[in-house]
Structure formats: C-alpha cells, structure tokens
UniProtKB/Swiss-Prot annotation:
Source species: Pestalotiopsis microspora
Function: Oxidoreductase; part of the gene cluster that mediates the biosynthesis of dibenzodioxocinones such as pestalotiollide B, a novel class of inhibitors against cholesterol ester transfer protein (CEPT). The biosynthesis initiates from condensation of acetate and malonate units catalyzed by the non-reducing PKS pks8/GME11356. Pks8/GME11356 lacks a thioesterase (TE) domain, which is important to the cyclizing of the third ring of atrochrysone carboxylic acid, and the esterase GME11355 might play the role of TE and catalyzes the cyclization reaction of the C ring.
Pfam families in the cross-refs: Cu-oxidase, Cu-oxidase_2, Cu-oxidase_3
Key words of the record: Copper, Metal-binding, Oxidoreductase, Repeat
Metal-binding keyword on record: yes
The protein's name: Oxidoreductase GME11365
Amino acid sequence: MLFSFLQETAYAVYGLWASFYPSLYQRPLSSSTRHLDHGPDNRGYWKDGFSIKTDYEVEIPEGKLVEYFFTISEAEIAPDGYLTNVTLVNDQFPGPKIEADWGDTIRVTVYNNLTNSNGTSFHWHGIRQFQTNYLDGVPGVTQCPSKPGDTQVYEFRAMQYGTGWYHSHYSLQYTNGARGPVVIHGPSSANYDIDVEPLLITDWYHADAFSYFHEEITDHAHIPTGTLLNGKGVYECDPTKDSRCVSPPGERHTIQFEPGKKHKLRIISSASLATYKFWIDGHNFTVISTDFVPIEPYVTDILIVGVAQRYEVIVEANATFEHGSNFWIHGTHCDDMIPVPWDTRIGIIQYDAEDNSDPYTPPLETTHPGYGCRDPPPTSLVPIVPRQVGNNVNGFSPADYLEIGLQSWPNISDPDSTIRKWVLANRTQYVDWREPSLRKLVHDNGKTNFTQDEAPIVLDYETGEWVYFVIEGNFTMRDPINDPRPIPRSVHPIHLHGHDFAILAQGDGYFSKDVVPNLDNPARRDTVNLPIGGYVWIAFQINNPGTWLMHCHIAWHASAGLSLQFIEQPSKIKPLVEASGILPEMESRCKDWTEHYNKVNIPLGLVQEDSGI
C-alpha cells in the first residue's frame, strides 16, 4: 500500500519542489540536439542530450524505477578465515550492490530481522536527498529506528551519478557489517573499456563493535585486526588452538585485467577507523571522480582514502611482466606514527586467469613511507561542472569556528575522569532515538526548540545564500583548569549530509584570517579529511531544507559525540514533510519504536549509551 502511495505522491512532491525552488529544479530534458552512444570512445556523453557537462543540480534525465529488498540479520561468518558475528544484508557481507542509472528512482525496502532487540535505519551516503530529508536514515535526527520485525521503504531520485555506498546509521551497527556499494551509472570525464565491480575497503574487527565502545570513551581506541577488500581478507591463525579459526588463512579479492584495456575502478572506504593509503604495484591511477563529483582527470600512483570517501579511477592494463603477471593491491593505515600490524597486501590484479601464484612483493621503499594522511591537493580536484562560491551570510569570527576536542564526562572540569567524549563546536552530541529532530520541527511548526545535547546549528537563510565553516583539529586548552581538552593524533573524515561542500582551504596548523579562500570552482565533495592538527574551510549553499547531520565518519568518534546537525530553513521543513505524505508512517514508526524501547530494551538493559548516530 505504501509503495503505490509513494508513487502517487511523487509528482505532487516534485511540483512542490519546483514551486519552492524554480531556479534549482527543472523537469528532465526530453529531447537531444545530437545523438552519440555512451561507449568506450564516448564516455563523456550519456543519452538524450545529457553529458558530463550537464549541471546535475539543474537537469536530470528521465529514469525508471529500480527496486531492492533488504533483510537485516546476524550470523557467524569468516570473511578472513576467522568466525565473527556479522550484521548481514540479505545474508551477505558486504551487502548487495545497488545499481541504477542517473535519473532513476531507487526504492529500497528494509526489513529488520535482527534478534538482538536492536533497531536499524539506513543511510545512503552521498545521496543529496534533495527535498527528501525524511529519507536520510539517521535515527534521532530524521527518523526513529525500525524495531525488530518492522519494514521501512526508502525511495529517492538518483540526481547525481558515480559511486556511493549505504550503511546502517544506528550507532555502531555498520562496523559490525551492515554496508554495501551504490553505483549510479552516468557519463565520465575520461574514456574506459571495462567497468570493474566496486571495491569496498573495510577495516575489520573480530568482536562486536558495541563491546568496544567503552574502550573508545576511556582513551583506548581498539585497533582493527586487519583489512578486507570486498569482504575478503587473510588472517593468520591456528585452528588447533582457536576453534574460531575455521578456514585459515582466508583469501584475497582478485580482479582480472585485460591487457591493453582501460579499467574503471570504484574505490570505496567503508572503514570505521583507518584512513588508507591505496596503491597498485606497477600501475598508475587516472582519477576522474571524488565522492559524487566528476572532476578533470589527473594522474597519480597513490590515493589517500579517508573513511567514507570514494574515488573513481581509470587504470590502464599496461604493466610490464618483469616479475610476473600478478600484482598486489595495497591498503594500509596512512599514519606511520601509529603502526598497525596489518599486511598491506589486500588484493591481487591478475592478467592471466590460470596464474594463481602470489605476486612479486617490491622493496619496502616502494610502499610510500612517510606519505602522510593528506587528501589530494584541492587544486587537483577540479569539478567538471563549475560553481562560483558566493559571499557568506553567516557569522564568521573565531567564535564561530567548529573546534574538535575531547573533554571529561560527565563533569568537564574533572581532569581525573576516566571517561572522555568528543566535542565539536563546544558540544557533545546525544540524540534521542524516540524523538527525532525532524519530527520535533514538524510538531513545533518549524520552531527550533532544541537542547544543547542535540547540537543544533540553525541556518535560517534564504535559498541560494552561502554559509562558511572552519573546522579545526588543533584545539588548545584555552581554559586548561575548567575545560581541559587533550587532542589525540588523528585524521577526522568530516561528512556532511544533504549537500556537497566546497573546500575553500585545507592546511596544517592553526587557521588564520590571512588564509585566502578559493571561491572560483573549488573542489567539492561530501567527505573531507581534516588534517592531523590542521584545519579545513568549507562552504555550502542553502537550498535543501531539513535536519542534516555533519560528523566525523570514524564510527567510534561519531558514537562518542563528534557530530552536530544543521537545521536548514526550518520554516520550510513542515510543508515538505506534509506534502510527501510520510508523516503518518513517521508517527507510527516512532510510536512502535518507543513502545519497543520502553518494554524490551530498558528492562534488558539494552539502552542507548552513545550519541545514537
């Protein structure tokens, strides 16, 4: 019944979008002035006159409905040869690939079949959810969780194209396995012959993520056991000494290359902690996309891939076979100052399907020691579709900087506290799964009556205005007695929901008013690495009413409060939610979840301890 209802209301909602945002939304083009096939020699063209030059925030192709059905469950599997309790999607890890074309409508029905009393909700990472904030999948912000036995339907338009991923946003649930790739086919800024299956890089743990939460808040971050590529890895163990060691040593993911062909790789970090150095022996990358933003191609032999970041690269199969026809795919933590006991060799490029020998391992100096954890220079990430950043409308003094730190909890003035939580902009976020922000705004008719714990920043500005934010990772103890905030060494991958942001500047040390912003078509993406001890200066345009989370995508940091939410154009939120017809379902889900939580979770002691997101 809900399926047909959503279909019936879709055009009404699109019409409402157009009435609110006539300059930002137009109906898809229906004719072409020139026809070129999208193929190996014409990847810049799509269909019906659309191309890599089309502004995808203004025009999108007509599309079809693509539909998926997900069942979320738990089981013991051994992706690296060691039995681990994993949260699965359709009995798979990683979950099934969502595949669509630019302009399609994607419908995913998610059934919670968990037996551990946990709820769930799913986020479609990088999807703007333009005017569909209620489908963003963040418990306590855009929805209540779905309780065990419940089903939720997510339906949204693929207005962007490229590579993304989906994951549970229910606390630390995705660290336990609930994640998978999203591929939205569209034009490309460089030609290629073969589109390879997406590559999910995952740092992996052998115990339940929720059991590690207390280690995180007591300054003892748990280091992953190793790395998986597309759900495969190698863990050396002895089955005679450990019954959970069932198929040692596991296996590595293998990619077949055709000599002379150009292969498109879609690299996705679905990690929870590690920022990866990623390279392939004997091959270069032509980078063509960052997150969901197509860019001017540039060539490199290594990428730093932060948690939740994505890159599309073209790799030409032109290697020399001096040491054989197999080559290692490498991935390891980027910070040499924090050694990890991982094998960098996470996969294999294979030219000859009959050759199953291990590749040659080059000398240590070829592993890019000392390369660091910095994103590619923003000047290398030039978007194909240009944007000029306008003047900021929000306050922009040092008091407005979003500073990251740790503070004692629950008493911030207690230097001897054994518990510390992350702080962003003087707040440690804690949301209430039973009373999401979006629902509160609808009930209160757009009034922003939020608590400090909900970490709101209200953006009540006109459509088209720009807002600027500096995020600093080098916070010092300005009040060391009353507000001590030590900063451990860490990259922070900062992710914004509902928008791509422009990167105006990114650097080491303290942000200074003398830093000159790049306002002329700067790099854009949805996840940026805040350098260790550095800063990043971002901007985005007001055009998408809703409650949008911004958080560090290190799962442990977000769980310990390193997040906030932007309340964008609060007065326009209720009309959009009401026009969508989603409100009765929202109310029903919150009623069911609250009853489940109060009657099941609380008596069992399975209560929310972390931020909730």
